[in-house]
């Protein structure tokens, strides 16, 4: 399970709270987005500005880390630095699936991973040329190309020779799993590229993906991707008291 921006259905996306909860819900990896501040700090934020997550129009590339760190996000959270997320991932034994949202963040991200001696990470982007540059620089981490709707994944990723093809086809149709054909899976295997699937919460779509030889599935609700832990008699080990009442009102 790859927690999309952390457990973002329950906590403000891309925050330490969202990543901590993702670990508690059983996610093996956290997907996160990185950008570079005006003074060269790699910050974890999806959008270029903080308008959507904080109601503040401050733009990441135009602001210093000191300015960004003072902004309170919705849910009483703050924008973390990449180093902070790495430290939390090390403590919780979690992996990082890092999406580059700015070209200038690429080499900084790679350098920080090396400096922190963090091994369990993937670096990806929709921009094949950014990933190609990391490949040419002999980046030691697995590289991923995110594939938008309507393009051939193999043609789109040719320039970068990625290790992973990440299909972002959630909104391609009401049954996007049907686009993950046997031919697509077979070709990706032949070319030595693993498959990662978009963020998904629809049970019927997840059932359609069940059994496919894919590396991972992203979700805002990572717990739905995890099998129930069971004892030797097949009895669930976990019983939720009044439901998952730390996420929603009890007994509802």
Annotate each predicted stretch with a short phrase:
Residues 1-252:
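Phosphate-group recognition and catalysis centered on beta-loop-alpha active-site segments
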């Amino acid at each position: 399970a790859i927690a999309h921006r952390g457990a973002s259905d329950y906590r403000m996306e891309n925050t330490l709270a969202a990543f901590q909860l993702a670990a508690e819900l059983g996610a093996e990896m956290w997907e996160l987005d990185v950008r570079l501040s005006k003074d060269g700090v790699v910050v974890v934020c999806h959008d270029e500005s903080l308008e959507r997550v904080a109601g503040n129009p401050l733009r990441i590339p135009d602001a210093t880390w000191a300015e960004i760190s003072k902004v309170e996000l919705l849910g009483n959270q703050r924008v973390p630095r990449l180093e902070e997320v790495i430290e939390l991932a090390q403590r919780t034994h979690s992996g990082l699936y890092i999406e580059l949202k700015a070209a200038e963040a690429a080499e900084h991200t790679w350098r920080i991973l090396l400096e922190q001696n963090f091994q369990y990470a993937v670096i990806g982007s929709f921009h094949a040329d950014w990933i190609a540059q990391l490949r040419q620089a002999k980046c030691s981490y697995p590289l991923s190309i995110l594939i938008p709707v309507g393009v051939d994944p193999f043609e789109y990723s040719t320039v970068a020779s990625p290790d992973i093809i990440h299909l972002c086809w959630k909104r391609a149709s009401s049954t996007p799993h049907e686009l993950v054909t046997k031919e697509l899976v077979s070709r990706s295997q032949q070319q030595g590229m693993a498959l990662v699937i978009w963020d998904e919460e629809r049970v019927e779509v997840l059932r359609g993906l069940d059994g496919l030889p894919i590396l991972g599935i992203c979700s805002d609700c990572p717990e739905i991707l995890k099998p129930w832990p069971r004892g030797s008699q097949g009895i669930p080990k976990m019983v939720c008291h009044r439901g998952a009442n730390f996420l929603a009102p009890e007994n509802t």
